[in-house]
Amino acid sequence: MACRKTYRKRTMPAGADVLRSMITQPAVADHVDRLLFGVDSKIQADDLLQNNITEFEWVVRNKIYPNFYGRYLTGENCLTKSEINFLHSKGCKIAAIYRDTEQKQTEEEGHLLAKKVDVLALELGIPDGAAIFLEIDEKETVTRDFMRGFASMLMTEGFTPGFKANTDAKFAFDREFSRGMQSDKDIFKLCLIWAVVPTVKEYNGMTTTHLIHPDNWMPYAPSGLTRKEIAVWQYGRDCHPIEDDAGNVTTFNLNLVRNEQVIIGKMF
């Protein structure tokens, strides 16, 4: 791991501006023909359920084949190399999510967290350029300075910064990200946003297989962005509960992507 990291840093062009220019934002189309379905879960996709199929197969049975699978790099059931191989064998892209409960106030705290993310991403073999979405809980106090530090350092490490957050204007993320778009647009415009609001009532905790996803793309967007620029929208939570082989209740969340280049270029 250390050798690979040293090699990558040595061969990268010097200068933060040059490094930042290597991270690109997927082009946004005014009109799209379809919305692309995917899921995210805190449960491993290859977890065997009580009915002798995997969580991935349970998703397919109850919805449709997912274009991507969002998985956490941290936590009790975090993403493993074995699960990466499993999902890739299914032809499914992976959206990397990082969850951390440490304070998110200063630019230096953002730098330090990005370095932690980089080490873990390298251990898992996540390729350069892939997006890593930092999950921000709606109850967390997060600042523009922290996000600027996190995003700039993660780009320096070769990854695309993203945030999975409540984008409603009533919460801190929306306000602080919007401040960042005003003061440091060159950094913040390269961040991908995974909006977890609004969820659509009939999709939350759903158990029916008849509804797949809403027809219209309606995530909340921070000021400084348009809805079309939101990368991922989580429109339903905690769906299709079922116990796994160990007796633990599993669920998954429902997501849409409007821009296929987010999946092609920023997931792995």
Can you say where each PLM-predicted feature lies in the sequence?
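Short, aromatic/basic amphipathic alpha-helical patches
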Residues: 57-59, 82-86, 149, 175-181
